[in-house]
Structure formats: C-alpha cells, structure tokens
C-alpha cells in the first residue's frame, strides 16, 4: 500500500502542483464593535487551521475547521504576509515562471490593503520602509534589488488593467479619457492566454517610477463609499509585471528569459441589503457578484474535473484562465472578517478557498528566446505595422466604418466563441460515442457468454428434472414414514409430558426437602456459632473475675501489712514512752529513797516488833493461799484447759473447713461451665447455710460477750478484794494480785483471740458462701451430675460445719460453767480469808494507829518529793496518749477506707456476676435459635407414571403399506378421470390452433405425470388431511399447466431472432 501511495504521489508531482491558498483574518473595525459582534474565527498559524464557530458562543460542538497552506491571524503584519507568500514566488518569477497572486474575499476584509497597502499619515517612511505598504510596492522594490544584485541586463514593464462592469480599462493610459474600452483576444501562441488590444505597457527603470505609476493608477481606479467600506473598490484590478533578463550561454550565445507576475486585486463580494448599494452601486455590485460567481463555478468545475470549464462567461475568468488550471504558479490570498455578523460571507469565502486548494496547475518555465529570434520577431512586428501604416495612408485596403467594423468584430468574436463551444461539444460527443462503442462490444461479448451458459444450464435442467422425479418418489415414501413417525412421536410426547409432570412433582418435593435441610443446617450453624461466642465470653468473664480476685487479695495483703506496720509503730512508740516513764519514775524513787531510808531505820524496829505477829498470820495466810492456789490450778486444769483445747481444735477444724471450702470453690471454678439445672436450689441452700452460720456465730459472739462481762465483773470484785487486802497486806498480796491479773489478762487475750478467730471465721464463711453463691449464680452448666456431686459435697461440708459449731457452743457453755464455779469458789475463799483477816486486822489496828502518824508524815514527804515527778510523768503520759490517739485515729480511718473499698469491690464483683447471669439468660432465651416448622416440607406419597414407551413399525412394513395405499388411490383416481372426460373438440378449432394443441397435449401429458406424482405424494398424507390434499392437488394442477405454458412461450421467444439495436437508440 505504501509503494502504491509513493507511486501515486510521484505521478501527482509529475502531473502538476496544487494552487497555494493563504487565509488572512483582519481585526475588528469600528462598525463591528458598535454592533456588539463577537468573534467566530480561531486562527492557528502553527497548525495552519482556521476554526469557525457556527453555533452559539458557548456551543463547543458547532465548529468547523479548515486547513490551508498558510494562516495569518488579526495580529499579522504586512511584512509577515509578504515574506511568507510573495518572496518564494518572486524567486520563481526570476527563474522564468509565470506567477499569479490574487486576493479574494468579502468587501471590506482587506484585499486592497493586502495588495496595495496604505501610506502612513506622518509620511516619514519611504515606500519600502513603510510598515503599511502592500504586496505590489514591496514586490517591485525587491525585484529591482534582486536584479541589481544579480548584475544582468534586464528590463521591467508594468501594466495596470481595470475590469469595471465587465468592461476593460487601462489605468496607465496617457490620455486623460479613462472611458476608452479595451478589447480582448485569444493569444495564438498560447491557447490559454489572451491579448488585450491597446493595453499600455510602461517600461520602469527604477523603483521611484513604480511608486508614481501606482499612485497614478490608484487615482484612476473606481472606488465608492458603502456601509461596509468607506473606500470600497468597485472594480477588479490586474497589475502585471513582465521581466526580460539577458543570459549568456557557455557557447557565448545570448538568450532572453521572460518572467511574468500578475498581482490581482479583486472587488469584494457584498450583500446589497447590508452594504446599502442602490442604483449605480447596486448594478456595480451585481456585476461584481456575477464575475465572482463565475470564478466560483470555474473553481468548482476544475475541482470536479468537468469536461467544460466556463472561462468565457466572465472577462475576469478569461484573464485568469492560465492561472486557474494552466501553466502558471498561482497563490490565492483569501481575506475574511472575524465578526459574527459576517459569518455567512466568511463561510462562503473559506469554502471557495478550500475548493480552490484542490485545483491542479502545470507550471512551465517560459521558453528562452535567442537574440536573433527576438530581433526577427520585432522585425516582423515592425514590418506588419509599416504595412498597416502604408495601407492607412494610401487607403488601398478595405475600408470600413467604425460601426461596421465593430459589428464585424462582434460577429467574429461571437462566431469564435460558438466555434469553440461546438468544438468542445464535438469532442465530448466523440468521447461519448467511443465510450458507447466500447460498452456495446462488452455487452455483445457478455451476451455470447450468457448464451453458452444458458445451453449448459438447459442440459443441467433436464438432468435435474429427472433427479427431481426420482426425488419426488423418494420424498413421498419418506413422507409416509415420517407421518407414521409423527403419530408415534405424538404418543411419545404425551407419555413424556406425563413423565415430565411426575419429574416436576418429585423435583418440587426434593427442593422442599433440601430447603428443610438448609433450615436445619442454618439453625445448627447459628447455635454452634452462638455457643462458641458464649464460651469465649464466659471464659473471658471468669478470667476477668479471677484477675479481680487476685488483685483484691493483693490489696488485702497490703492492708494487713499496713495494719501490722501501724501496730508495730504504735507498740514501739508505747515502749519508748514507757521506758521514758520508767526512767522518770526511777529518778523519782531515787529522790524518795533518800527520804524513805531515813524512816526505814526507824520503822525496822517497829517491823521487827510486828514480825512476830505477822509471821503467824503469814503462815496462816500462806496455808490458805496454797490451798486456794491448788484449788484454782485444779479447776483450771480440769475445766478451763479442756475448753481451751476444744476451742483450739475448733479453730483448727474451722481452718480445715475453710480449706475444704476453698477446695470446693476450686472445684466449682473447674466445673463452672457444667452447672445449669439446680442453680436456684444451690443458691437458696447456700444462702440458708450462710444465715445459719452467721446466726451461730452471732450466738457465739453474744456468749463470748457475756463471758467477757462476767470475767470483767469477777476481775473488778477480785481487784476490790485484793485492794482491801493490799491495804493490810501490802507486800504479801502484791504477788498474788500480779499473778491474778496476769491470769485474767491471759483469759482476756485468749477470749480476744477466740473472738478474732470467730470473726475471721465468720468473715471467711461469708466470703466463701458469697463467692460460692456468685459463682453458682453466674454460671449455668449443662452437666447436672457434676453439679449434684458438688451440691452433695457442699451439704456434707455444711453439716460438718454445723456439728463443729454445735461442739463449739457446748465447749463455750462448759467454759462458762467452769468459770462460774471458779468464781464462786474464789468468792467463798475470799469470805473465809476475810473473816480470818478481820481478826488479824483488829490486832493490827492499834499498831496501825500508832504508825499512821509516821506514815502520814512520810506520805507528806513522799508526796512533796514525788509531786514534781508525777507532774512530769503525767505530761509525758498525756503526750504519749495524744500520739497514740492520733495513730489510732488514722488507723481507724484507714480501716473505714478499706471497709468502703471492700464494699466497692464486692459491688463490682456482684455487677460482674450479674452481667454474667444476664448473658447466660440472653444466651438461653434469645441467642439460641429453634427450628420453627414452616408447613412446606413435602409428605411421603406415591408417584403414578407410565412405564411402557410406544415404538414405530419397521421401515419395510411402512413402505409395504405405502405401496398398497398408493395402488388403491391410483385406481380410484383413474376411474374418476375416465368419468370426467370432456366432449371431443371440433376440427376447425384444432386446425386454427395447431401449435397450441400440440402444446396442450404436451401439457396434459406432463400434468398426468404430475397428477400421478401428487397421488403418490397423497399416499403419505394422514387420513384426517386427505380432503385438504385433494383440493390442493387441483390448485397445483392448474398452476402446473400455467407454468408449462410459460416455459413453452419462453422457448419460442428464445428461438426467434432478436434485433440488436445500439444502446444510444434505446436511451
């Protein structure tokens, strides 16, 4: 394909060259701005495109794009147009080519400005330097510069022709009368060229003369003011520049090279309604538009390669004949307006320019003339002019008046035009005849070929008819077999419908079962998913509770450590205070000792006197004390020690129970996922157990409180008795009082420990029971057996705890009874000892009265000496009490805070347990999905369907039946035909139409064959369609007769010779 394109392009280059088309758009003028017109043109100089917006302003789709050789926008300058368009053409003119540049477009778009230009208003520029100068002055200026640079001999001749109202005028004529019309003739040397008789050619020697010539021609040219342009050109102008250049060959021969440049400024097309032209201006506009319309038709004919080009319809096109499709290099400058009010004229101009781009010229270099040939031509021209001059002087030739001469010349011109037109028509007719002859020969060959093909086709038709006859017989047999198969097929179709209905029912039932299984599967999947989620949540919840319990145990351990440290600090402070008090007391006793030592010596004598009396009393009192001690020891050993051991055993047993409860709690934690059914019963039983335990412990606490009160009363009574005894027996009874106080403090400490152990036991029981209740209430298990086992174990532990509490209460009762007996015995002993001591006291009264004064004086001295020390000790004790009170207050506050924190922790655990219970309820009541019956599951039933299929008879049996039916139908039809025979036809009618009778016999013979075939075909028709088949046979028989007659007529027509008329006559 590429080689073919290259070949075509090379062939195109050999044939010629397209006309160069340039588009120039001028800026907006004042009239367009006043009319508020917008721009409809977009000039792309780089892409050489002009885009016209044919729709509204915002319509992006209504655009049309044209592509040209060059495009100049409104900002383009005169020098830019000249350098791009004219400079290359000027070089070709100097090379010897004929070139043409003409401006085309609407009036007022800048054609004259482009070709001629204007003079600047300040007149400080020369023609060649003026930025407003057009193509014509710049071209002549550059011609002289280039020819001067080359250095050859040259001559330049210019002419300026005006075409006004289809008349030719010479604008450079020396006569002042511009109205002299010029005549135009065909150039005999150039078939496409013209000669204008009387056109003045002026030789130009320098550029200054050129500018004078241009000014003179512009002054004579027809211009007028219209609404479109104040200086509108009313005529076409053709400025021709002919250059003769001298060349010398290698051999020394002198040649003359001729180049010609035509610069054409066309008058603009205009809308008379818009331009406001009337009368004379309207006629001018009509002639201008007529010539431009002819130019457009010439361009269209050249583009479409029409056989006739209407050059002679206008003088403008006759002058431009060689430039349009001839041997001249042509460039067209199309000037347009960007305003929307001139859109129609702009589109028309661009369409003409786009079509003109396709015109093909064949530029040729002008033949170079030798000096001798040119001199010979000039000599012949001089001789011809001399003869015409001599004839005019001598009046020997033919003399005609001007009117006759002009009339004769007009006839000659019209005849020449007619001859030209007729010659063109003759040439066209000859080409048409030649084309028709070739077409006739081709048709004749095709006819011969068709005849041979027709003969072959007739032979093939005969063979095909024979084959058709055989095929009909086979078709009849096959039709009978097919009809039998159709009946079998219908029966099978009914059976298949029954089977399909059964299959549909079974399929519907199976789909219902599958839907039931899908629903079951969906419920199971949902429950398994919910179960997994519930297990994960419960594990997560118990791990959180376990973590919380660990944190709380750590916090409680911290609280215990804090309490221990606080008590240790308090004990340390107390010990330090006691040590300080002891030192102060020692100092006071040291000061008192001095005073007492003075009286001791005096008292020794008196004590020695009383020693004898006290010794006897001492012995009696020692006897009583030993007896009382042994009694107390025996009572303590026999009564209190077993109770204490029993209480200790009870404490260990309760600790063991606590450990067992902890083990049970661990078991409950291990089986927390298996408890489900007996949640309420376990909660109630544990709650009852906790109440019983708390009531028992409260009873123990009350008994302990009563025991403590009794011990306190006993201690107070004993202390009173001891104080009474001390007053009489100071030194002897101090030891007894100390021992008794130690014993009672031991009892109280043991009782406090017992209370602490019982309180801890109660707290532990409360914690264990509450933990058990919370754990059991927050976790429902599915395995009831393990829950029952745990319940039995808890009940056993509860029973053991109850028995332990009963034993503890019994031991406490025993302890109370023993303590009461001891107190009674002590009271009796005290009474007996008091009676004995009364006697002794009476004896000592006298001595005491005597010693009283001494002791009082000593007492005063001791009081005076110990007053200061007592005050000091009191102050220290007060300070120590205040410090201990502060410490105890802070400890009490800390205990309250810890108690509140424990309450908050308990509430938090209760909330977590309650949330776990809620999740369990949600799991059991909401998340678990039940399989709800829908009522669409199919029931079991029996299906009824046919089990046997019908089979068609064998082919041999069917064919035998077909032959029998065919024989029967043939016999019946032959009998019907014999009965329906028509009467004999008259001889005259037979003699009148002999060929038709022959044809009828042939037709009847063929119809009999067709009838037999139809009978055979009818044999295969089912019995319920045989009547319809008979009616169709009659219709087919008539159709067959008509078809045979038409075939015979066609054969007769083919046998007759046909007249072969030429195609021209038929047309």
Curated annotation (Swiss-Prot):
Phosphothreonine: residues bearing it: 937
Binding site for ATP: 105-112
Entry-linked InterPro entries: KIF11-like, KIF11-like_kin_motor_dom, Kinesin-assoc_MT-bd_dom, Kinesin_motor_CS, Kinesin_motor_dom, Kinesin_motor_dom_sf, P-loop_NTPase
Keyword Protease: no
SMART domains xrefs: KISc
Biological processes per GO annotation: cell division; microtubule-based movement; mitotic spindle assembly; spindle elongation
Tissues where this protein is expressed: Highly expressed in unfertilized eggs, especially in the germinal vesicle and in the radial yolk-poor channels. Also present in testis.
One Gene Ontology CC term in the entry: nucleus
Coiled coil (residue ranges): 365-480, 692-721, 882-915
Modification after translation (UniProt): Phosphorylation of Thr-937 during mitosis controls the association of this protein with the spindle apparatus. A subset of this protein primarily localized at the spindle pole is phosphorylated by NEK6 during mitosis.
Ranges where the Kinesin motor domain occurs: 18-359
Gene3D superfamilies: Kinesin motor domain (3.40.850.10)
Pfam families linked to this entry: Kinesin, Microtub_bind
A GO molecular function held by the record: ATP binding
Modified residues (Phosphoserine): 1046
Annotated compartments: Cytoplasm; Cytoplasm, Cytoskeleton, Spindle pole
Outcome recorded upon mutating residue 937 to A: Disrupts spindle binding
Entry annotated with the keyword Nucleotide-binding: yes
Binding partners and assembly: Heterotetramer of two heavy and two light chains. Interacts with aurka.
Family the UniProt entry places it in: Belongs to the TRAFAC class myosin-kinesin ATPase superfamily. Kinesin family. BimC subfamily.
Function of the protein: Plus end-directed motor protein required for establishing a bipolar spindle. Associates with both interphase and spindle microtubules. May be involved in nuclear divisions taking place during the development of unfertilized eggs. Required in non-mitotic cells for transport of secretory proteins from the Golgi complex to the cell surface.
Protein name: Kinesin-like protein KIF11-A
Species whose genome carries this gene: Xenopus laevis (African clawed frog)
Gene encoding the protein: kif11-a
């Amino acid at each position: 394909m590429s080689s073919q394109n290259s070949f075509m392009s090379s062939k195109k280059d050999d044939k010629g060259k397209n006309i160069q088309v340039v588009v120039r758009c001028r800026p907006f003028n004042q009239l367009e701005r006043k009319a508020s017109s917008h721009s409809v043109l977009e000039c792309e100089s780089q892409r050489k495109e002009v885009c016209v917006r044919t729709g509204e302003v915002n319509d992006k789709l209504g655009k049309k794009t044209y592509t040209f050789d060059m495009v100049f926008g409104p900002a383009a300058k005169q020098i830019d147009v000249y350098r791009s368009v004219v400079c290359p053409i000027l070089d070709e003119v100097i090379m010897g080519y004929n070139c043409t540049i003409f401006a085309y477009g609407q009036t007022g778009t800048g054609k004259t400005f482009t070709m001629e230009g204007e003079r600047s208003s300040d007149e400080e520029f020369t023609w060649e330097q003026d930025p407003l100068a057009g193509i014509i002055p710049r071209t002549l200026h550059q011609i002289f510069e280039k020819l001067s640079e080359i250095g050859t001999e040259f001559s330049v001749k210019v002419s300026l022709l005006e075409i006004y109202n289809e008349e030719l005028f010479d604008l450079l004529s020396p006569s002042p009368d511009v109205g002299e019309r010029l005549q135009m003739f065909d150039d005999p040397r150039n078939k496409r060229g013209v000669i204008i008789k009387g056109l003045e050619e002026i030789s130009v020697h320098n550029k200054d003369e050129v500018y004078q010539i241009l000014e003179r021609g512009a002054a004579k040219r027809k211009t007028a003011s219209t609404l479109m342009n104040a200086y509108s050109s009313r005529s076409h102008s053709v400025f021709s520049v002919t250059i003769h250049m001298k060349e010398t060959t290698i051999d020394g021969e002198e040649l003359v090279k001729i180049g010609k440049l035509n610069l054409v400024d066309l008058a603009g097309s205009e809308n008379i309604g818009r331009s406001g032209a009337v009368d004379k201006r309207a006629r001018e506009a009509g002639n201008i538009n007529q010539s431009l319309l002819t130019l457009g038709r010439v361009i269209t004919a050249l583009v479409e390669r029409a056989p006739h080009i209407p050059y002679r319809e206008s003088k403008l096109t006759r002058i431009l004949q060689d430039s349009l499709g001839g041997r001249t290099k042509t460039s067209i400058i199309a000037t347009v307006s960007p305003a929307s009010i001139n859109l129609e004229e702009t589109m028309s101009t661009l369409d003409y320019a786009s079509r003109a781009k396709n015109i093909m010229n064949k530029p040729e270099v002008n033949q170079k003339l030798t000096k001798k040939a040119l001199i010979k031509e000039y000599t012949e021209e001089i001789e011809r002019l001399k003869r015409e001059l001599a004839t005019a002087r001598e009046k020997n030739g033919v003399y005609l008046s001007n009117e006759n001469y002009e009339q004769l010349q007009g006839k000659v011109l019209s005849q020449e035009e007619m001859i030209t037109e007729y010659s063109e028509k003759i040439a066209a007719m000859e080409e048409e005849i030649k084309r028709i002859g070739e077409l006739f020969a081709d048709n004749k060959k095709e006819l011969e070929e068709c005849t041979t093909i027709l003969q072959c086709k007739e032979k093939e038709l005969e063979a095909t008819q024979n084959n058709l006859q055989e095929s009909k017989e086979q078709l009849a047999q096959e039709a009978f077999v097919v009809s039998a198969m159709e009946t079998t097929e219908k029966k099978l179709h009914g059976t298949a419908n029954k089977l399909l209905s059964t299959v549909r029912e079974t399929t519907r039932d199976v789909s219902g079962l599958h839907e039931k299984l899908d629903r079951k599967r969906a419920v199971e999947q949902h429950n398994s998913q919910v179960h997994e989620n519930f297990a994960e949540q419960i594990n997560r919840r118990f791990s959180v509770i376990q973590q919380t319990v660990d944190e709380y145990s750590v916090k409680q351990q911290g609280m215990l450590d804090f309490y221990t440290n606080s008590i240790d600090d308090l004990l340390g402070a107390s010990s330090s205070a006691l040590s300080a008090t002891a030192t102060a007391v020692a100092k006071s006793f040291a000061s008192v000792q001095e005073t007492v030592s003075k009286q001791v010596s005096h008292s020794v004598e008196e004590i020695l006197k009383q020693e004898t009396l006290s010794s006897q009393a001492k012995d009696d009192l020692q006897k009583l004390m030993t007896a009382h001690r042994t009694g107390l020891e025996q009572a303590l050993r026999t009564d209190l020690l077993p109770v204490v051991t029993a209480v200790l055993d009870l404490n260990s047993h309760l600790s063991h129970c606590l450990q067992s409860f902890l083990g049970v709690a661990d078991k409950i934690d291990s089986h927390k996922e298996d408890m489900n059914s007996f949640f309420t019963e376990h909660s109630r039983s544990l709650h009852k157990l906790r109440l019983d335990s708390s009531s028992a412990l409260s009873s123990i606490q009350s008994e302990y409180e009563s025991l403590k009160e009794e011990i306190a009363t006993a201690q107070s009574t004993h202390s009173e008795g001891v104080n009474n005894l001390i007053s009489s027996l100071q030194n002897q009874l101090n030891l007894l009082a100390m021992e008794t106080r130690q014993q009672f403090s031991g009892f109280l400490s043991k009782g406090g420990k017992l209370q602490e152990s019982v309180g801890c036991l109660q707290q532990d029981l409360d914690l264990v029971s509450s933990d058990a209740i919370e754990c059991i209430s927050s976790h429902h298990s599915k395995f009831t057996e393990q829950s029952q086992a745990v319940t039995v174990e808890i009940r056993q532990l509860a029973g053991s705890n109850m028995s332990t509490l009963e034993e503890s209460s019994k031991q406490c009762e025993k302890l109370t009874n023993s303590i009461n007996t001891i107190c009674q015995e002590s009271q009796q002993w005290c009474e007996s000892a008091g009676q004995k001591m009364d006697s002794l006291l009476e004896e000592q009264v006298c001595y005491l009265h005597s010693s009283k004064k001494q002791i009082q004086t000593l007492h005063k001295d001791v009081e005076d000496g110990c007053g200061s020390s007592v005050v000091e000790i009191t102050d220290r004790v007060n300070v120590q009490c205040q410090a201990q009170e502060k410490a105890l207050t802070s400890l009490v506050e800390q205990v309250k805070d810890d108690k509140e924190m424990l309450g908050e922790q308990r509430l938090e655990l209760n909330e977590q347990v309650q949330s776990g219970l809620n999740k369990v309820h949600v799991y059991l009541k909401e998340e678990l999905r039940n399989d709800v019956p829908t009522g669409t599951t199919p029931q079991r039933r029996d299906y009824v369907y046919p089990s046997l299929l019908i089979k068609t008879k064998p082919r041999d049996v069917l064919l035998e039946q077909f032959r029998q039916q065919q024989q029967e139908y043939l016999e019946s039809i032959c009998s019907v035909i014999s009965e329906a025979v028509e009467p004999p036809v008259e001889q005259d009618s037979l003699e009148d139409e002999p060929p038709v009778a022959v044809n009828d016999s042939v037709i009847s013979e063929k119809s009999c064959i067709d009838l037999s075939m139809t009978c055979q075909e009818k044999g295969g028709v089912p019995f319920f369609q045989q009547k319809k088949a008979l009616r169709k046979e009659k219709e087919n028989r008539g159709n067959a007769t008509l078809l045979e007659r038409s075939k015979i007529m066609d054969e007769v027509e083919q046998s007759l010779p046909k007249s072969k008329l030429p195609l021209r006559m038929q047309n």
